[in-house]
Amino acid sequence: GVATSADNYSQYWNPAKYAFASNNKGIGLSYTPYLSKLVDDIFLGNILFFKKIDDRSSWATGLRYFSLGEIQFNEFIAGSIVDQGIQRPSELTLDLSYALKLSSEFSMSVAGRFIYSDLKVAVDADTSSASSLGIDISAFYQSEIFKLKSNSALVRSGINISNIGPRLNYESGAQKSFIPTNMRVGAGLDIFFDDDNVLGFYTEFSKLLVPTPTAVFDSEQNLLGYKQPD
């Protein structure tokens, strides 16, 4: 989460947390299959690495790859279904972040992201893959440990505005697509019972910061689809 304790995967939630990491470095690997009961080739893969530069700062990098698997395209021509081939659409991001403690309890981070989206249909000459750049700006607060009745406790909070950047252009002359600019805000409390047992209470809110598509109707008020605002 955006406000939970730092871990190897903080790059995708709140890179500012790395400044409070207890380890000097770490690596994360994950593989998440999608719709595994229906298909076996849709998945999300991640690899991450972070390293603390000193007690106040750290850097991290990450690679994320999403595969939509093999998709068979067909076209209905003159009453017959014509095979248009198999496509393997995918998306990839490459991140780099830097986090710095501005005080003993507060840190901020900035991250840069290269985005590559290959969702084109090969038989359509007007479409192509698209790329863009995104920036994340995040902050993290972690209080000093204090007494809460008979136990120790601390408070954490965080905010991350991610994917600030230009839109993707899949087709020349067509409307561009927004990248998913998003804001996460969260806070929580950790209660320590002993060295091995911690109880945490956290809440988080997320808001997509791009325009909502508007419905398009014909003259008889039949829904034709949705249009993305400029």
Go through the PLM ranges and name each one.
Residues 1-230:
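Subset of outer-membrane beta-barrel
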